[in-house]
Amino acid sequence: MSKYLIYTCCFHQEIYTDVVSNLINSFKKSGSTADFLVYTTTQYKEIIQAKCPDANVLFLEKNFYKTMNQARISKLDIFDYPGIEKYEKILYVDADSLILKDPECVFDSIQDDVVYVVGEGNILNEGEYWGRSLFLKENPEYTDREGMSAFVLGFKNIQTIKKLFIKIKQSFYLDMYQNKLRFYDQPFFNFYLLQNKMCNTETFKSLARSRPTPEIALKDGLAIVHFAGCPGHGNVKLELINEFKSGLVVATPSVVDTPSVVATPSVVDTPSVSVANETIFLLQQQLEEMRQKTAQLEELLRKQLNQ
């Protein structure tokens, strides 16, 4: 039995079973000896098992998570898994990701009693993606600093982390009923992990990254790549994943056999790309707010027509 656990979540839309299948297959090819867990519904479990019949995957089932908000915060339920006490270290990976090599190097880098994440963006960015309103509510004079992405979370199996996850989840659901959520779970992870000084935002930068080119991913020896953008749109995710995989075939015959190299500064880290990513996130937020307003107007019209 492995002392390491990797897990992901699959709820809300059936097309994400295809997205998760890509992640599972990439994990298998990596040669990892870690256990792999999918948190999903009974229906999606059966679909995933049919798509990945040879994968030795564990499952945690919950059948009443239906909305995007529930899907996004489900990653915090990991301590509900009955066998969780068996593991020393745990690694969450977003479903819309690929594992390019044995993630043991990722587990080895988890040394302190904090959550390891990938630092990105700035917490006071107007796009709200990194928790601007939460930080300013705490302190209107809050000093800007680097934010973080929750697409990968590495941590030890300790009570401190479990209690922190419970606190984040409680705050998330309270806000969901009282206010309009912006970018789902991401702002809450930023606020609680950074405010409580409970995260390492540097170590994973050389191991995991969002949307690198295949060439840069191989050159920098990345273990995990994430296909950020368009949350809830599985077709877009699959297009991004397939495009990346095609690029990998051109770049190298075998990802698993590619020797890792020390990460070096690349075009992904340049300010121009960072600004572009922030612009993308801002546009996504605006589109989501427009979608919500349209739904509210449609509901209002239906009520008026039924009067």
Please place each PLM-identified region on the residue numbering:
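N-terminal anchoring/stem segment of glycosyltransferases
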Residues: 1-66, 83-86, 228-237
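A residue-level signal for conserved active-site and pocket-lining positions in enzyme catalytic cores
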Residues: 6, 27, 79, 96, ...
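A structural signal for well-ordered alpha-helical segments within the folded catalytic domains
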Residues: 18-21, 73, 77, 183-191
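Non-transmembrane alpha-helical segments in soluble domains
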Residues: 24, 28, 107, 169, ...
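A glycosyltransferase accessory/donor-loop signature
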Residues: 38, 143-145, 149, 155-260, ...
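GT-A fold catalytic core of metal-dependent nucleotide-sugar glycosyltransferases
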Residues: 71-127
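Conserved catalytic core of nucleotide-sugar-dependent glycosyltransferases
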Residues: 108-171
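Helical coiled-coil/dimerization "stalks"
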Residues: 292-307
